[in-house]
Regions:
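Conserved beta-propeller blade repeats
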Residues: 8-34, 41, 55, 59-77, ...
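Terminal targeting/pro-maturation regions of precursor/exported proteins
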Residues: 202-276, 280-282, 304-306, 310, ...
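Cleft-lining beta-strand/loop regions that shape enzyme active-site pockets
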Residues: 234, 311-313, 318-320, 335-533, ...
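Extended, small/polar residue-biased N-terminal targeting/export presequences
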Residues: 255-308, 370-398, 578, 583, ...
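Blade-level signature of beta-propeller repeat domains, shared across WD40, Kelch, NHL, RCC1
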Residues: 70, 74-95, 186-206
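PDZ/PDZ-like domain segments forming the peptide/carboxylate-binding groove
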Residues: 292-345, 420, 543-544
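Short glycine/acidic-enriched loop and turn motifs that connect beta-strands
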Residues: 37-40, 82-84, 153, 193
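Multi-bladed beta-propeller domains
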Residues: 1-20, 35-36, 45-63, 91-111, ...
């Protein structure tokens, strides 16, 4: 049968992974689909299956996804953040919208459904059904109810939207589906398949045995072809940075015969895509080898000491050894751990690996000998906790240095990354540290990137427009948390991705007087991930970031107004010439003297 193009959606690439979501109506006469509208909104459109004019049925600058038709053809369900995250219902005809939730009853269709849509004012017939935000596809069951996963558990929403109920507990469920009988569900949990009743209750693991031949070479060839095809369809630059992507496929296909291990295969893919000279293109090989977890002792070691014991160099504030009952001082020696004598060699880590409780007994002395030592018992830190503590102490020390040098007039705030948790932290700390300051230093050095720079810029563009004053109360600047004072941004060669977009935007919008530090690396592009046969993971750049002058930020990092290099010796000594320069530039400007 001849294929027919219903509608072309530039940039969505249905043939690749990701892109547009679409759903056929119960009578196969309509298609509901999502596509980007404007700069950031995703709206839902409906188009006749035989072609015709598509209609935007959500019409709001918000995120809409997962369109799902009701089995009776009266409603279209979807996820959105248009009025808070949750589940929404669109009535396809006005009479279905006017029915109150109390009177709304599901009647199972007795004959094939014919979907009728009145598009006049359809975007005004939207109702929020549940504030529970789904993390899976929506499933409209034969009984009229909706099912979905959230936080690894199954949720059920009644046809009228008056009841949202969690039918399972314990989480960890993925790949959820309702069976054809409408009474049972299947899902994956812990890598195994289960079946259970749709309304909860006992779950049965589905076990089976099967012989199969794992053709590793064929699997890798399939992964190679899919990797190449995905980049061919979805790489942001159709010109592939001036490279011949077809020729690169042939070049590296010839090398497939020399690949023996998963790591070698992922390396080959990285070499092929590396010729595009684009960032965010990592390929990760699967690993079935369990890696031991090594907790952190909670102090740094002075490696100049040779011989018995670990000489303690520093014990950071907040580490177990900084508290009175478990105090360990700088310069003391750890003679043994749980009775095993130690020194600063690789055997030390074998004593720490894979300890679930991480509780140890240390023998501590002020000299490298067992005689006269005391016992200290505490729980070791995880590597993540150690990194977080070290980071917090460094930020606190830098903030204190800025406030001390400026006599409390200049505030300091570090942005470690650009995730939602970093946004919440920024808003919390900005309110705390901006108050009473004449100027601020925003530091994105070593920022790992993310996606919130636009939100931060919006926040910093809030400007005062008035003052609110109550009787016997201090005046309040309106709007709340508005900032209209001096700013300098610190950045360096380890500010990545969205952490590079932030200083550019601060300068472009006139929010920062100066950018101080070292040019960023130009690791700037919007990316997404995809999977390959064999368990390989890859990332692909899908959207470029251009400055207002048209220059691409990819491989073209942001340059500072004032270049200040930090030498290794300065870093080791705890000096910060970049901060010093920012403080110098933010000193009050001298006023001109009248003759």
């Amino acid at each position: 049968e001849k294929l027919k193009t219903i509608i072309k959606l530039p940039g969505t690439h249905v043939r690749g992974r990701g892109g547009v979501e679409y759903e056929w109506s119960p009578d196969n006469q309509w298609i509901a689909y999502t596509t980007r509208t404007g700069s950031s909104a995703f709206n839902i459109w409906i188009v006749p299956a035989d072609g015709g004019k598509p209609v935007n049925v959500t019409r709001l600058n918000a995120f809409h996804s997962d369109p799902t038709w009701s089995v009776d053809g009266k409603y279209l369900y979807f996820q959105s953040d248009r009025d808070g995250e949750g589940l929404y219902r669109l009535a396809l005809k006005p009479d279905a919208f006017r029915i109150s939730d109390v009177d709304m009853k599901f009647v199972k269709p007795s004959k094939p459904v014919k979907v009728e849509i009145d598009f006049d004012g359809i975007h005004r017939r939207i109702t929020k059904m549940s504030s529970q935000n789904p993390s899976s596809d929506l499933i409209a069951a034969a009984d009229g109810r909706l099912y979905f996963l959230a936080h690894g558990d199954i949720y059920r929403v009644s046809y009228d939207g008056r009841e949202t109920k969690k039918t399972t507990t314990g989480g960890r469920r993925v790949a959820f589906r309702v069976m054809n009988d409408g009474r049972r569900v299947t899902f994956m949990k812990g890598g195994e398949m289960y079946v259970g009743k749709i309304d909860g209750g006992p779950e049965t693991k589905i076990t089976f045995e099967a012989d199969w031949i794992h053709d590793v070479n064929a699997e890798r060839m399939a992964a190679f072809n899919e990797f190449w095809k995905t980049f061919n369809h979805r790489f942001y630059d159709a010109n592939f940075h001036g490279r011949d992507w077809d020729a690169l496929r042939i070049k590296y296909l010839k090398r497939m015969g020399s690949v023996d291990t998963p790591m070698e295969f992922s390396t080959l893919l990285q070499m092929m895509v590396g010729e595009l000279e684009a960032s965010h293109t990592e390929v990760t090989a699967p690993s079935d080898t369990p890696k031991p977890t090594t907790p952190h002792l909670g102090f740094t070691i002075d490696h100049s000491h040779r011989g018995l014991g670990l000489k303690v160099k520093t014990v950071p504030k907040g580490a177990p050894g900084s508290f009175e009952k478990t105090l360990i001082k700088s310069g003391e020696f750890i003679i043994s751990i749980d009775g095993s004598m130690v020194d600063a060699n690789e055997r030390l880590y074998s004593l720490l690996n894979a300890r679930e409780d991480r509780i140890v007994e240390l023998l501590v002395n002020d000299k490298p000998q067992k005689s006269g030592a005391r016992k200290v018992r505490y729980q070791l830190m995880s590597q993540t906790d150690w990194r977080d503590l070290t980071y917090q102490n460094q930020v606190t020390a830098t903030r204190r240095a800025a406030e001390t040098a400026s006599k409390g007039k200049i505030g300091y705030l570090h942005i470690a990354a650009m995730s939602s948790s970093d946004q919440a932290r920024f808003e919390r700390e900005a309110y705390e540290y901006i108050l009473g300051k004449d100027a601020m230093i925003f530091d994105v050095r070593n920022n790992r990137g993310g996606n919130i720079s636009d939100t931060l810029i919006d926040w910093l563009e809030r400007k005062p427009h008035g003052i609110y004053q109550s009787r016997d109360q201090s005046p309040e600047v309106a709007p709340d948390r508005a900032w209209n004072k001096r700013v300098i941004v610190l950045m360096n060669e380890h500010s990545y991705s969205n952490g590079e977009m932030f200083p550019y935007a601060m300068r472009q919008r006139g929010l920062a007087e100066k950018l101080v530090g070292i040019a960023t690396p130009g690791y700037v592009i919007w990316t997404s991930g995809f999977s390959l046969p064999g368990g390989y993971k890859a990332r692909i750049p899908g959207k470029a970031v251009y400055r207002m002058d048209g220059s691409n930020m990819e491989n073209n990092g942001e340059k500072p107004d004032v270049r200040v290099w930090m030498t290794p010796d300065e870093w080791i000594a705890g000096k910060d010439p970049q901060l010093d320069k920012a403080l110098e530039l933010l000193q009050p400007k001298p006023t001109a003297q009248k003759p």
